[in-house]
Amino acid sequence: MTMGGVDEGRLARKFWIKFKNESVFIMYSPFFVSLASGTLNSDTFLNCVSQDVHFLKAFAHSYELAEECADDEEDKCAIRKLRKRVKHKLKTLDTLVSEWGFELPEECITNNATLKYTDFLLATASGKVEGEKVLGKIETPFEKTKVAAYTIGAISPCLRLFAFITKEIQPLLDPNDSSHVYKKWIEYYCSENFEELTAQTEELLDKLSVSLTGEELDVIEKLYHQAMKLEVDFYSAQPMVQPTVIPLSWVKDPVEGQLTIFCDFDLTCTAFDSSAILAEIAIVRSQKADPDQSESKLTRMSSADLRNTWGVLSTKYTEEYELCIDSILPSEAGKFDYKGLCEALKQLAEFERKANSRVVESGVLKGLNLEDIKRTGQLLMLQDGCRGFFQKIVKCENYKTDVHVLSYCWCGDLIRSAFSSGDLNVLKVHSNELVYEESISTGDIVKNLESPLEKRQIFNDIVKDRSNNEQNLTVYIGGSPADLLCLLEADIGIVFGSSSSLRRLGEQFGVSFVPLFSGLVEKQKELTNGGSFTWKRMSGTLYTVSSWAEIQAFILGS
């Protein structure tokens, strides 16, 4: 099995997977979105490509230093071959750029972003890591090998980034369209030849790292990550002379505009469903209360009975939910039919109300302690990048933002506690609420939000008082059928995750699901061809992402 072109069970693969989100910020940069669309200003492209001269020179010198540090003759030979390939590319760069359809400027001045990476790489290759001179502390030739490993660790992510990003872009190209001016450049970095070079570099990193200590492997990991971040900085620093559709926050007028973010909670923000979390709180509380029968009036059932009841409720919900979805699907997929979708979702609304009534009647929510809920919420595992995105969005000072969480969750206190740190208490929560008596839940629920139509009503109530000019933009982020109407009503609907129920339901009613990156590439083409920055709500098109890094890169940039 492979991921991003990297084989399993290897150090290079481990690092790539761990820091792959950094590549998202490069891919979603104005530079690469414009390049992928074929509309990137040629001067901007040449300004970037001209920096290859400085990168290649730094690679060549670093390989030379790494070869001196390598202890094994086979490793020395492998490094020498890599250096030879770099020197050949440096020598033939003018010809290569000409084959891509461009001509390098006579003078290639190093920019600051390039200098930061090349200085970092050459310092690493010279044995200076984290501000300390490593070579001065080495006593044997064998120990010098780690400097060679450090050097390759600082080079390999640069190659993998190019291989990965261009392979993401290539499927978006029309094979019959010869007008895409960057097609040859993309094909060069998608080639088997470049993948072979990347793989050889990663294999060398793995081989050089075999004998290293855990502490030394940690150093390589830090160097690998630092190299990735410097690449992000490099592409973020590319001067853009054309209008671009991203980052979204750059497009908005900082004075007149407002960006309103709506978001689901369960499995969009969280790694686990909130009902399962509340079930676990109830069971743990019951186990604590079992020895003391004085609390039985609060818990009402033993922990074993409680676990069994939760299991029955959960199984029944899952089975009947799928049957409900199947029953409301049209026999054939057709054109986008919002009205028909609304009618179908009324049946789902009735199902959700009955399911909630069963939960209340079962008594499983009785006896929950508010402090337990808040403590669990504060420790709740959110999706990677979710908290960081919201922390950045609420602190952004150059435009107005408003953030709302719309959730079926039975307990608003759980959501508020999950966002209680990092200035996130400004997020407005719309959900159901548990009923308490002296901080102990009675088992009842204040049912504020039980259906897709109620979610839509809250959404519309929030946005109805705002003017409809282009500078007021709504973004909805969700991942279940409950979010479908809001996703379609928002200016931009972003589907997080891979809910098969959402896909099946949407597709049968004519909803299109488009990967966000490819949607941005098309939007950039439209903008360059005289289109506007405006996003069209109720278009029947939703945009899919697999990480919060994509959402952050799209809305805020790097």
Which positions does each model-derived feature cover?
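Terminal targeting/low-complexity segments that flank the catalytic cores of oxidoreductases
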Residues: 1-55, 59, 68-72, 169-255
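Glycine/small-residue-rich interface belts in oligomeric ring/scaffold proteins
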Residues: 48-51, 55-66, 297-305, 310
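C-terminal cap/substrate-recognition subdomain and adjoining C-terminal extension
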Residues: 185-190, 245-256, 376-558
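Active-site-proximal alpha-helical scaffolds that flank and shape metal-associated catalytic sites
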Residues: 6, 16, 24, 46, ...
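Active-site nucleophile-adjacent alpha helix/oxyanion-hole segment immediately C-terminal to the catalytic cysteine
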Residues: 61-64, 69-70, 271-278
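Acidic active-site catalytic centers that drive phospho-/nucleotidyl reactions
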Residues: 52, 264-266, 479, 483
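Alpha-helical substrate-recognition element adjacent to the catalytic core
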Residues: 247-437
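Eukaryotic N-terminal low-complexity, Ser/Thr- and Lys/Arg-rich leader segments
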Residues: 1-17, 21, 133-140, 239-258, ...
